[in-house]
Amino acid sequence: MNIRRFKESDAVAVSAVVIKTLRISNVKDYPAELMEEVVKSQQPQNILERASWTHFYVVEDGDKIIGCGSIGPFWGKEDESGLFTIFVLPKYQGKGVGRLIMETLEKDEYFLRAKRIEIPSSITGCQFYRKFGYDYKNGVAELDEERLYRLEKFREI
């Protein structure tokens, strides 16, 4: 397994990883119709746009992309960052790929400069992120209007 920065040529493969994961893993926690709406926003052009303002990483097994994750400024703030688009192909879940992504994101300069890091978390990923010390924003353990949990972690910098 190897983790590296995203290249534009990865967009189609990353989109496929995200979409497959949404349709197999996330659909267990959300209606299929909602997942198909989310799929529309995870096309290669959407991935390229997100990669333009984040530090986007991919995990490879050989030459196959099996996971991804990104970190970027939270609404343009210098001292707050957000984690986005963290997905691992279902076949590779539970094998340390997600941990590798999180460890990499938490070494990135956007993480290291931030006092607060926020994750818009799916129901599917919530407990995974909580293992890394992220907790419910303002203590609110309820889904927001996007049907996501807002998780956050504070750091001393």
Residue ranges of predicted features:
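Conserved N-terminal entry element of GNAT/NAT acetyltransferase domains
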Residues: 1-12, 154-157
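Acetyl-CoA-dependent GNAT
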Residues: 5-9, 16-90, 102-104, 142
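Short alpha-helical functional segments enriched in proximate histidine and acidic residues
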Residues: 21, 108, 128
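Active-site beta-strand termini and strand-to-loop segments that position acidic
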Residues: 60-62, 153-156
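Conserved acetyl-CoA-binding loop-helix of GNAT-fold acetyltransferases
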Residues: 88, 94-107, 131
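Conserved GNAT acetyl-CoA-binding A-motif
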Residues: 102, 109-122
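Conserved catalytic-core motifs of GNAT/GCN5-like acyltransferases
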Residues: 118-120, 135-151
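Conserved hydrophobic/aromatic "anchor" residues
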Residues: 128-129, 134
